[in-house]
Amino acid sequence: MRAYEVVYVLTPDLEEEQVEEKHNEFKSVIERYGGAPGEIDVWGKRRLAYEIDDYQEGIYALRKFQGENQVLTELERSLKMDESILRYLIARDEDA
């Protein structure tokens, strides 16, 4: 399995419990398709470089994980369909 990391930005109007649910939801997608979720680093609410969908702030999080192509495909599909995601980026983790 290859190592990856995903950075995503959630809308700032989510409650703390909702944010935790989102983190767990993406973790379960990784596990469901044979991946191994790693550590998550929640950066919290930060100002965006530019306005996205009328939001000037977002809740940033970085999750490391390992997986094959199907994990990437399904995680990306979940991120695209989730309306509380403003932006995301999945990259291969060269340091792992």
UniProtKB/Swiss-Prot annotation:
Q: Which residues form a coiled coil?
A: none
Matches recorded under InterPro entries: Ribosomal_bS6, Ribosomal_bS6_sf, Ribosomal_S6_plastid/chlpt, Transl_elong_EF1B/ribsomal_bS6
Please indicate which superkingdom the organism of origin belongs to: Bacteria
What keywords does the record list, in alphabetical order?
Ribonucleoprotein, Ribosomal protein, RNA-binding, rRNA-binding
**The keyword Hydrolase belongs to this UniProt entry's keyword annotation:** no
SUPFAM superfamilies annotated for this entry? Ribosomal protein S6
Q: Please report a single Pfam family linked to this protein.
A: Ribosomal_S6
Q: Give me the Gene Ontology terms describing cellular component.
A: cytoplasm; ribonucleoprotein complex; ribosome
Q: State the similarity comment.
A: Belongs to the bacterial ribosomal protein bS6 family.
The free-text function statement in the UniProt record for this protein reads:
Binds together with bS18 to 16S ribosomal RNA.
Q: Which NCBIfam families match?
A: S6
Instruction: Name the chain's protein.
Output: Small ribosomal subunit protein bS6
The protein's organism comes out as: Natranaerobius thermophilus (strain ATCC BAA-1301 / DSM 18059 / JW/NM-WN-LF)
Gene name linked to the record: rpsF
